[in-house]
From Swiss-Prot:
Biological or metabolic pathway of the protein: Cell wall biogenesis; peptidoglycan biosynthesis
Name of this chain's protein: D-alanine--D-alanine ligase
GO biological process: cell wall organization; peptidoglycan biosynthetic process; regulation of cell shape
Positions that bind Mg(2+) 2: 260, 262
Source organism superkingdom: Bacteria
């Protein structure tokens, strides 16, 4: 099969995407497929560069990759691709929309408000949410332009920074607890990872630098494990996920809260999904093969 590995793109996560793409290519080649590296530098590249491939493996992150646009183009061209469809991708990229659906479905998530300008900042509403808060681009990833703000004095500056990366900014209560991630493959949860950043939170450096954080497979207490698994599965169903996603949570006093869903989890050597799969004996090459297989089974 001729597999095009699509990477690069136009988002702030371009370098992360290129790293993911290189790793994916290295291991897909072990499966004896014909691999075509496809580096996207501008939106128009997609239509031209995917000609002649049988399957698109998406190693893109962020805008024009994770937000449903590339998925829609590939679907229009009748080219099968990895991961979730356009609707789920678009919703999960929009943190505000994701949290609205989670709240409607009675799935725990931290309180938040969104603003689209400095003038929109409602300090009373933020006080009700409770400090400290995370201020971040509504549709950003990899914790780019994400700041932990401890009081009202830092809000304006943090919002201004986030607005450089997105037209909407989320201000979300900081739920202090243990951060965990649940990797879902074809609707089943792989082993849970605990994320223990060496910085105050799991920022860009902690995510991608060697030694930036400790990410370890953990065995949760039985009752908590059941709650986490039920919540991850509820997210999968409510947001109509397909093939694979990563559900990030915080556990506070034995109660899990969903932070966000990642529909195209990173595939670098430091990435969480391969670590979780490896804990049940699924090698990186086998994981990629499963993603291709399950993606081809989805009716688009």
């Amino acid at each position: 099969m001729k597999i095009g590995v699509i990477m690069g793109g136009i988002s702030t996560e371009r370098e992360v995407s290129l790293n993911s793409g290189r790793e994916v290519i290295k291991y897909l080649e072990l499966l004896e497929h014909e691999i075509i590296p496809i580096i996207i530098d501008k939106k128009e590249d997609v239509v031209e560069k995917v000609k002649g491939i049988d399957f698109a493996f998406l190693a893109l992150h962020g805008e024009f990759g994770e937000d449903g646009t590339v998925q829609s183009v590939l679907q229009t061209l009748d080219i099968p691709y990895s991961g979730c469809g356009p609707l789920t991708s678009a919703i999960c990229m929009d943190k505000d929309m994701t949290k609205k659906i989670l709240k409607y479905a009675n799935i725990n998530t931290a309180d938040w408000v969104n603003v689209s300008s400095v003038e929109d900042i409602d300090y009373e509403a933020i006080e009700k949410i409770g400090y400290p808060v995370f201020v971040k681009p509504n549709s950003g990833g990899s914790s780019v332009a994400t700041n932990l703000v401890k009081d009202g004095d830092g809000i304006k500056e943090a919002v201004e920074l986030a607005l450089k990366y997105d037209k909407e900014v989320m201000i979300e209560n900081y739920t202090k607890g243990e951060e965990i991630t649940c990797c879902m493959l074809n609707g089943k949860m792989l082993p849970v990872l605990a994320i223990r950043p060496h910085a105050e939170f799991f920022d860009y450096t902690a995510k991608y630098a060697d030694g930036g954080s400790d990410e370890v497979v953990i065995e949760l207490e039985e009752n908590l494990h059941k709650k986490v698994e039920e919540m991850a599965l509820a997210c999968w169903k409510e947001l109509k996920c397909e093939v694979y996603v990563r559900v990030d949570m915080i556990v506070k006093a034995g109660v899990p809260y969903v932070l966000e869903l990642n529909t195209l989890p990173g595939m670098t050597k430091n990435s969480l999904f391969p670590k979780s799969a490896n804990a049940v004996g699924i090698s990186f090459a086998e994981l990629l093969n499963s993603i291709v297989k399950y993606s081809l089974e989805v009716e688009r």
